[in-house]
Regions:
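Active-site and adjacent substrate-binding regions of carbohydrate-active enzymes
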Residues: 1-183
């Protein structure tokens, strides 16, 4: 598992995020690992916008498995709004995994619910509505620094069970049912 691999290569005057050299290193690691033991799989953890995340498959010569980071916030957004438009649209637009690769679908982790993966999928209004709903349910929001000193929401810190205690209209009696449905 290559954790936060998108930040691997550091170069002055860049964001140090998702640079071409990082992809070269992942390809090199895959070549070395396949030579040593072809049964070993590389999984990349890249909590970045979905399009950039997909780039870690390369041409079938980088990661064998990538975390599907857009799935948790999209399921959450669909469950609390009652609208599956964005989730369905994303699912229908996802390319099939190439031969020898696959997606790791998950709906919760020890980290927060990332918002970067849904940049370009959810509108800013939808993201803000999700943030406000999660704050109402006790969630905290982590932010990242942007150029110029401003901040942008990065992650919602709340358990999935707590996040599903209601809808945008507020808490209700369907938390357990909603939690089971998410699975």
């Amino acid at each position: 598992r290559l954790d936060a691999v998108a930040f691997l290569w550091k170069e002055s005057n860049t964001t140090c995020l998702n640079l071409p050299q990082t992809h070269e290193i992942v390809r090199l690691l895959r070549t070395l690992i396949e030579h040593y033991d072809p049964s070993v799989l590389i999984i990349t953890e890249t909590n970045i916008p979905n399009r950039e995340n997909l780039s870690y498959f390369g041409n079938g010569n980088e990661a064998h498995i990538i975390y599907n980071f857009a799935l948790p916030p999209l399921i959450l957004q669909a469950m609390v709004t009652g609208n599956n438009y964005y989730l369905n649209n994303w699912l229908m637009s996802m390319p099939p995994a190439q031969d020898g690769t696959t997606y790791l679908n998950f709906i919760a982790s020890h980290d927060g619910i990332g918002l970067r993966p849904v940049e370009g999928i959810l509108s800013q209004q939808e993201i803000q509505e999700l943030i406000e709903t999660m704050r109402d349910f006790g969630g905290l929001i982590s932010s990242r620094n942007l150029n110029g000193g401003s901040e942008k929401p990065y992650e919602i810190n709340i358990s999935l069970f707590s996040a599903l205690q209601g809808t945008v209209a507020g808490p209700d009696e369907l938390q357990v049912e909603r939690f089971l449905c998410a699975h």
